[in-house]
């Protein structure tokens, strides 16, 4: 089955690579319209997925990731329209010039070809990936989690209808709809057809892909994110940022999981934090350095376990640790962070610059929430993933991350001397 999907996707990719920006945008507009026109069908499929997932004991965090509502689906359709408004990177000349030999050379952006994406209970990923791939002239082979197979099937059906309506092959966007896990292993060996693989899921999936894939893999999306409250931080705005970073949507990978507090501000800051977290329904997991100050506050507090510093909670849970100085804060982030998103709250430019330079994450913030690590927030449109590695892309992966380049030389019967 996968062999035939790969053959069809590769053939479709050649056709997509030749489309103009106008033609690609027509497809995307059609997809957005069809998503809205067939909302009831997609939501019906999603309701069946939700019912099965709840019966199977999925956590509330996972159920939130899985759920679609009319508002969320409308937002997904609007995200597709936003991709239409983005500049098409394909064909863009990156650099070049006239060489001494008389050869005029340029480096031009081109599609990667076929993108494979393996993801878990995130039905919006289906549309996000499809829209970004189509905008950049790439075909896509998608393998969603078994929790979302009905939703994914309904969504891909809509996308394929739009493709065919525009005279393009349905194979430009395909989904593996079988829940058979053996197919994941088979997909990882499809380097003959798939040019880049992106896993979006837990640490186990990323490890599997890194160890078994013969396809270049972009990993990321696991967010053990930190906020360091410097001794010069102003408490009211700091609390506002922390509430946003923890509670706005706890199931996302850019949610803060560990709070590091400078000891010189801890006596004043921790009681205020406890009050705010109690109001927000957040359970605090406190290090011995923070536990005495937090135990007397209104927030629910538990002693933190060492392994919890490596946990991506995706829930209303927050580790709290008092540190001696920035050295200890940076050392903690280096040991337990996932190079996703980390922030410092400070009023000292010197401290801000040091944190920026020494914390090696894909996104580093000064006096801002970690929740901004998102393609839409960065002005990239929808994102295909957040990469926490350094090759070939880093941070939210927008359109440019789905392209490569080729060197083109223009001569006038030019030969090498």
UniProtKB/Swiss-Prot annotation:
Gene Ontology molecular function: any one: glutamate-5-semialdehyde dehydrogenase activity
Record Pfam families: Aldedh
Subcellular location: Cytoplasm
Alphabetical list of SUPFAM superfamilies matching this protein: ALDH-like
GO terms for biological process, alphabetical: L-proline biosynthetic process
Coiled coil ranges: none
Pathway the protein acts in: Amino-acid biosynthesis; L-proline biosynthesis; L-glutamate 5-semialdehyde from L-glutamate: step 2/2
InterPro entries for the chain: Ald_DH/histidinol_DH, Ald_DH_C, Ald_DH_N, Aldehyde_DH_dom, G-glutamylP_reductase_CS, Glu-5-SA_DH, GPR_dom
Any one Gene Ontology cellular component term annotated for this protein: cytoplasm
Reactions that this protein is recorded to catalyse: L-glutamate 5-semialdehyde + phosphate + NADP(+) = L-glutamyl 5-phosphate + NADPH + H(+)
Entry's EC annotation: 1.2.1.41
Domain of life where this protein originates: Bacteria
Location (main, coarse): cytoplasm
UniProt KW keywords: Amino-acid biosynthesis, Cytoplasm, NADP, Oxidoreductase, Proline biosynthesis
HAMAP family noted in UniProt: ProA
Family: Belongs to the gamma-glutamyl phosphate reductase family.
Function: Catalyzes the NADPH-dependent reduction of L-glutamate 5-phosphate into L-glutamate 5-semialdehyde and phosphate. The product spontaneously undergoes cyclization to form 1-pyrroline-5-carboxylate.
Name of this protein: Gamma-glutamyl phosphate reductase
């Amino acid at each position: 089955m996968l062999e035939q999907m790969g053959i069809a996707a590769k053939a479709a990719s050649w056709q997509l690579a030749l489309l103009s920006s106008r033609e690609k945008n027509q497809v995307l507009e059609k997809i957005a319209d069809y998503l809205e026109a067939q909302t009831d069908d997609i939501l019906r499929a999603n309701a069946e997925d939700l019912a099965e997932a709840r019966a199977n004991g999925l956590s509330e965090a996972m159920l939130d990731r899985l759920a679609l509502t009319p508002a969320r689906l409308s937002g997904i359709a609007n995200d597709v329209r936003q991709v239409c408004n983005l500049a098409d990177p394909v064909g863009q000349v990156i650099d070049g010039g006239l060489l001494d030999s008389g050869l005029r050379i340029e480096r031009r952006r081109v599609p990667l070809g076929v993108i494979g994406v393996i993801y878990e209970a995130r039905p919006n990923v289906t549309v996000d990936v499809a829209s970004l791939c189509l905008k950049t002239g790439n075909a896509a082979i998608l393998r969603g989690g078994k929790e979302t197979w009905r939703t994914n099937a309904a969504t891909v059906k809509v996308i394929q209808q739009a493709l065919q309506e525009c005279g393009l092959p349905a194979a430009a966007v395909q989904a593996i709809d079988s829940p058979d896990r053996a197919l994941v292993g088979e997909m990882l060996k499809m380097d003959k057809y798939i040019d880049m693989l992106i896993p979006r899921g837990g640490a186990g999936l990323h490890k599997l892909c890194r160890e078994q894939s013969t396809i270049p893999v972009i990993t990321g999306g696991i967010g053990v994110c930190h906020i360091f409250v410097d001794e010069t931080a102003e408490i009211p705005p700091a609390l506002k940022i922390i509430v946003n970073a923890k509670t706005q949507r706890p199931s996302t990978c850019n949610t803060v999981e560990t709070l590091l507090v400078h000891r010189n501000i801890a006596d004043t800051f921790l009681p205020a934090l406890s009050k705010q977290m109690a109001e927000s329904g957040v359970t605090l997991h406190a290090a011995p350095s923070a536990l005495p100050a937090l135990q007397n506050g209104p927030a629910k507090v538990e002693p933190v376990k060492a392994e919890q510093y490596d946990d991506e909670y995706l829930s209303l849970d927050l580790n709290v640790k008092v540190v001696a100085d920035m050295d200890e804060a940076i050392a903690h982030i280096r040991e337990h962070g996932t190079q996703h998103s980390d922030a410092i709250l400070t009023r000292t430019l010197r401290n801000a610059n040091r944190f920026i330079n020494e914390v090696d994450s894909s996104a580093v913030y000064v006096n801002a929430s970690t929740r901004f690590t998102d393609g839409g927030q960065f002005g990239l449109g929808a994102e295909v993933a957040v990469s926490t590695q350094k090759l070939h892309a880093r941070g939210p992966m927008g359109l440019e991350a789905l392209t490569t380049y080729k060197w083109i030389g223009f001569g006038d019967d030019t030969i090498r001397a």
